[in-house]
């Protein structure tokens, strides 16, 4: 969104949420762009033609896309996301993206991140702060910790 570029908006968000919000959003925007660039390289060079780290960067951008940018308009919970929930999910996705992962090959990366995205999507369907929501969040954090 262009709003994030305006100082007035940043000031408003800093008061309404916190001072780190715009920096985190900009970080995720940069990761999305980097993921798109890497997707193009993978398409040209093939999966084996790029380092495993490139696949990790690409799949981190997919997490951002699937978990934050895509919403299910037909789901009562996911259709409308209050600010507190947005902040919580954004922080979780930032943590996922900042984590360093260890993989032996690109297929391992793909399988891992598909499972992680699925858990995140299931969390998006759960009522915020419910037992189910918190359980999904715990599973996600455990899954991230296992690969570090």
Summary of predicted features, one role per range:
Residues 1-148:
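Conserved catalytic/coupling modules of large nucleotide/cofactor-utilizing molecular machines
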């Amino acid at each position: 969104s262009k709003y994030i570029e305006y100082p007035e908006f940043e000031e408003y968000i800093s008061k309404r949420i916190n001072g780190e919000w715009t920096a985190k959003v900009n970080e995720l925007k940069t990761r999305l762009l980097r993921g798109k660039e890497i997707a193009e390289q993978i398409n040209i060079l093939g999966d084996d033609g790029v380092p495993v780290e490139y696949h990790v960067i690409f799949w981190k951008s997919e997490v951002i896309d699937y978990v934050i940018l895509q919403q299910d308009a037909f789901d009562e919970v996911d259709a409308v996301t209050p600010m507190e929930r947005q902040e919580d999910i954004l922080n979780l996705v930032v943590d996922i993206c900042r984590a360093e992962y260890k993989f032996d090959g690109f297929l391992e990366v793909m399988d891992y991140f598909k499972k992680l995205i699925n858990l995140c999507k299931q969390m998006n369907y759960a009522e915020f702060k419910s037992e189910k929501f918190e359980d999904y969040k715990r599973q996600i954090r455990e899954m991230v910790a296992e690969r570090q």
